[in-house]
Amino acid sequence: MASSKQADPQTDARPLPQDFETALAELESLVSAMENGTLPLEQSLSAYRRGVELARVCQDRLAQAEQQVKVLEGDLLRPLDPAALDDE
């Protein structure tokens, strides 16, 4: 059986990472461990629960980044008018 940190049955007890990159790296590690098929059932369920939480963190961070880009871009995000390019 795998005895790595990824398969730790206490993964649900650890605090969630607050940054996208750390959450994504942990999520990828959990997915890899589950895909190997060597985790016992309880550890697989624990890893799956943790993975769902990490996926939510990633989705939230991406949504926040998208909102920041929209705010920064403001009116610049509009369809391209080819006729306007001809006038220049």
UniProtKB/Swiss-Prot annotation:
InterPro entries: Exonuc_VII_S, Exonuc_VII_ssu_sf. One of its GO terms (cellular component) is cytosol. It is found in: Cytoplasm. It catalyses: Exonucleolytic cleavage in either 5'- to 3'- or 3'- to 5'-direction to yield nucleoside 5'-phosphates. It holds the Pfam family Exonuc_VII_S. GO terms for molecular function: exodeoxyribonuclease VII activity. GO terms for biological process: DNA catabolic process. Its EC number is 3.1.11.6. It is an enzyme of class 3 (hydrolase). It comes from the Bacteria. Its main location: cytoplasm. Keywords: Cytoplasm, Exonuclease, Hydrolase, Nuclease. Heterooligomer composed of large and small subunits. Bidirectionally degrades single-stranded DNA into large acid-insoluble oligonucleotides, which are then degraded further into small acid-soluble oligonucleotides. HAMAP family: Exonuc_7_S (MF_00337). Belongs to the XseB family. This is Exodeoxyribonuclease 7 small subunit. It comes from Bordetella pertussis (strain Tohama I / ATCC BAA-589 / NCTC 13251). The gene is xseB.
